[in-house]
């Protein structure tokens, strides 16, 4: 760390009135492009309009202008999020049974949507308990609201209005910071300042504010709710905040004020900042005193982290220096040059952020069931399944997006002359070794993982169960996973002697938490069946990575097409007269990667859904006997392909197929409709552009005959557009089919 003289004076980092506000300009479609602004000659125009409207790189080469547009668009995005959130809270206030659910969360199901009987669809309003008719929701908002300390629908109303105010503020900020006071490029590139503010402000103060809310509002209200106090009798949030004695009745250390803090007797506060582990037996959620403690600790960490980087004060770390100092004995120039990449290519920056956020989202999916953070979440099986599925899909899309933007960076922003012998250059130079090894791994995993299933199917068909890979014949136990489970189950006694349980009940030990006769969580046993399907996970993930990484590493050039960078990010083939060069563009790799991402995530959510129904979820008798939803059939049924088809897909589809005439009938229609959308995609994916152009020309001829020819000439979709439409419908159809299948099933049996 070097000490240097501080900056002489504060620099002016904004430009006043750079772009005038003009509704006339915005009203003109395609105003951002000279070609598009001329208006449509052919139907291709509308496709290009949508493809390029947000491709700011194509509007201008000026990095400052691009940065401002991205910055402004972020405010627009935040406005949309606030409007969406406001809508969720408004539905909770206006159309929900939240107050009824709060009074009896084990018997009443959450609902915040009531269907209007316009053409007789009032059948969809099922009885969710407590005399309320509506659609059962599975978003987890009720559980989140209870954890936040919301006790009435009036509070939801006011929060909804607050959301709209914030949305308006964001829309104003987006306009203001583009048209009135736009930051200069140097401001966007000032990474140290940005790190300090984002770490200390967003994450540090954000966590501190949430911890404060949890301690002063959530904890006392939830403690009273857990004790069975009527929500209407509970003091309002501001009373707890303003009246310390109220809090001290529930948490005695409050009467001591800040004295223990300044005298370093922090353990005095252990009545509301705990380290218990496990779940609250009343609600089946994490102890809220544990989560308050967690957020306070996170706040401290990030407040420190937000003071680490060198700005005007000449003290602290410099990002450029850190990166350039990173040199290993075998890595050449190391990270040299990466600072310049990340401050001049927003695609490179975005690629890293998407990869990190996508991975994090998938980690969140797993924590939501292993450590259910909100009260009564763990026993709401439909919500648990929905949250897991949702976070897995989102994580998959973000990771594919990371590869997409990494490839765009390679094509548009990478300058080989400035990157010599640093890590990026070295990776690119041995890309053939990387991709061929990865390919070998994929072949190995594919044949071996699938081969184990095929072996089992064959032995099963031949009536030789003793020769199958299973827990009762030839065992393939996941010994490493079991070891990890075991060490974590035993860890608290060694590392955290005051903790009453391990971080998650899933690790093992004898603990089982049940709420209202339903299992919240118990130790999850892993066996041969899990070993088999985990290798399918490994296979699908590696193939997805192979496709995406090949797209990035060969985005600029390959042995087949050395000048690929000149062809751009997306192109159908390497021109006429050169056969066998289609589907080589970076865009095509993203397109192909999406299908394997869909494969990978589908297997994960199928595994989760069946495993939880078989080995975790179920009811518990007064004698303590657990009856699982599918009676523990996962271990013996999921070890064959036939078992997956018969005992999972077919057996569990009975609810969605038989949903007609019930309140779940919408899922039956969705199941049907989404299958259609999925099949519709194949029409785009399995036919070439020429076929359609030929058809269109014959239809246009007929129109000419009748003198009703359009002024705008109809054109078939380009090859790339056809693929985009195809993959969009494939994914939409596939995901909506899964959604209907999962929800009809779990709402019926959960």
Curated annotation (Swiss-Prot):
The protein's superkingdom reads Eukaryota
- List of residues binding phylloquinone: 692
- Where is [4Fe-4S] cluster annotated to bind? 573, 582
Q: Name one GO molecular function term.
A: 4 iron, 4 sulfur cluster binding
- Name the Enzyme Commission number(s) assigned to this protein: 1.97.1.12
Q: How is the cofactor bound?
A: P700 is a chlorophyll a/chlorophyll a' dimer, A0 is one or more chlorophyll a, A1 is one or both phylloquinones and FX is a shared 4Fe-4S iron-sulfur center.
InterPro entries found in the cross-reference section: PSI_PsaA, PSI_PsaA/B, PSI_PsaA/B_CS, PSI_PsaA/B_sf
What are the recorded Gene Ontology BP terms?
photosynthesis
Q: Which enzyme class, named as a word? A: oxidoreductase
Show the stretches that span the lipid bilayer: 70-93, 156-179, 195-219, 291-309, 346-369, 385-411, 433-455, 531-549, 589-610, 664-686, 724-744
Give binding positions for chlorophyll a. Answer: 683, 691
Q: What's this protein's family per the entry?
A: Belongs to the PsaA/PsaB family.
Quaternary context = The PsaA/B heterodimer binds the P700 chlorophyll special pair and subsequent electron acceptors. PSI consists of a core antenna complex that captures photons, and an electron transfer chain that converts photonic excitation into a charge separation. The eukaryotic PSI reaction center is composed of at least 11 subunits.
Described by its record, this protein's role is as follows: PsaA and PsaB bind P700, the primary electron donor of photosystem I (PSI), as well as the electron acceptors A0, A1 and FX. PSI is a plastocyanin-ferredoxin oxidoreductase, converting photonic excitation into a charge separation, which transfers an electron from the donor P700 chlorophyll pair to the spectroscopically characterized acceptors A0, A1, FX, FA and FB in turn. Oxidized P700 is reduced on the lumenal side of the thylakoid membrane by plastocyanin.
What's the protein here called?
Answer: Photosystem I P700 chlorophyll a apoprotein A1
Q: Which organism is it from?
A: Physcomitrium patens
Source taxonomy lineage?
Eukaryota, Viridiplantae, Streptophyta, Embryophyta, Bryophyta
